[in-house]
Amino acid sequence: MVQTEIQKNFSHMNDMQKQAVFCTEGPLLILAGAGSGKTTVLVNRIAYILQCELCKPWQILAITFTNKAAGELKERICAAVPEGGADIWAATFHSTCARILRRYGDRIGYTSHFTVYGTDDQKKLVKDILKQLNIAEKTLPVKSILSEISKAKDKMLTPEEMRKEAEFDSRKAQIAKVYEIYQTKLKTADAMDFDDMLCNTVKLFETAPDILDYYRNQFKYIMVDEYQDTNKVQYKFVSLLASKYGNICVVGDDDQSIYKFRGATIENILSFENTFKNAKMIRLEQNYRSTQNILNAANEVISNNTMRKGKTLWTENGQGEKIKVHTAENERDEANFIAQTILDGVADGRKYSDYAILYRMNAQSNAIEQALSRSGVPHRVIGGHRFYDREEIRDMVAYLQVINNPHDDVRLSRIINVPKRGIGATTVSHAADIAAGLGESIYDVIKEAENYPQLSRASAKLKAFVALIDGLIEAEQSGEYSLAELYNLVIEHTSYEQYLKTEKDNPEVRIENIEELSSNIVKFEEDYGDESDLSAFLEEISLQTDIDNYDADADTCVMMTLHSAKGLEFPVVFIAGMEEGMFPSVATMMNPDELNEERRLAYVCLLYTSPSPRDYAAS
């Protein structure tokens, strides 16, 4: 079938959407306003490429920013292209990099079982390093150190380069020293943090040209969603992959760039046409989600910004209701107003899940949550206590991580005396010191505990722990047990349920949680079939975000920060604390660049409503 005939299959799309779908060759920037059907365009563009037989399905790479978005994209692609849709690479940056590193990480010194450290693991590691260096946390807070390390990795700076940059800045020089030890300890533990996954993939491509050639030959068409949220490393990654065919399509909106604090650089999207030779740009300005009153407000807010591509959103949905402003006496009055408005709406036939309450800072949530609880309004705080952050879940996952990678010192230290085995903190500290001196892992040291005088008194207990872990590793490697069965072996061999019953408060709830983890493992095995091994499961949960677990079908109103709500939509949105000093925040009001970002945040949050918007700004 010739391309002109195939194009008739896409008559349901508007003219600009069709232009974006049919423009398959060369660099393309799709400047997609909120609610303009960008996912529809991505899905149909992939379908068009495959229907025209321009490549094989596995030659398409589609990158999104959340697992939830990647899953939805893959599902829609499979529905649009039943034959071969499942073979497309549709994943997040981190998942894509993890897949490459699991296969070729040995070329830069990692095994295929490397561990991914989350925020809590990173904090624990940095705290240990500060103790080692005799630096007080008050003088150099852990959060600040990790932020500086992340910024350095975004710029692909090594610890040595960071130290040179510091020059006469003693604080930054100290952080560079922590960074150096941090990276050494990660490597010894066969572990990476999230930034490393991107940096190490770029490093792999730059040091192993044969691997870069393999992947840039494979991916004839590359598509990146939410391009305005990319950082320098992500730009480097996709530009390397696109360097052969040049068929890179990025979808984004410079007016929705709101993650500068996470390292996102708006320059990636603003300079796209200069960076990629002969690039084209197509604007998607028709909005299918909101009403014109909402769009007028959003357009007016963002028009005050400088350094933007420029676009004007419009819709055929009609004018709709006007934005409503409620002026509250104080935060308690504001919270009570929100709760009562929700109750009134539900009495009129709305669902609790129609409502979202957004705020600039987490500190604003307490008064609102209390008012909702007093009023009996069911609610959920997105960004609150995640399932995988619960103590008992972290314990069980730590056991699985150590079975997968016994050299993971952070996870091993967590469970070496849980449940209690008479292995005290002093013994673990001695083992860690010996390991650091030898450049080995704690596991390597305690396997030979009898050879070290500092460990001799505890050697029998340490050897018993090693025997437990070795037995579980052997069970995992034997292939005789499913993942769920292996998990049950861990619970059984550690007597973990008994430990919860005798040592912890609320044991029934905690046992329910570890049973829920078992259910999650069973579901993972059902979903992934032959690919459902231990490494894959641990990778899956390490890359999850709270938004990935958001259940749109649950009839509860949701509370979250403005940044957390990106990509979601609700019929009724409350924007709490929209007052000078709060939103925009005091810190941004004297800095033009920061104020531009704050306007972009206001622009984005005005566009969270669909399809009958009723926004409330309380001030």
Model segments located where?
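A basic/glycine-biased coupling hinge at the interface between accessory DNA-binding modules
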Residues: 2-8, 25-28, 33-36, 47-221, ...
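Conserved phosphate/pyrophosphate-binding and hydrolysis machinery centered on Walker-type P-loop NTPases
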Residues: 14, 63, 90, 115-119, ...
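Helicase P-loop NTPase motor core
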Residues: 34-42, 46, 277-280, 285-378, ...
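Conserved helicase C-terminal RecA-like lobe
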Residues: 168, 351, 365-377, 390, ...
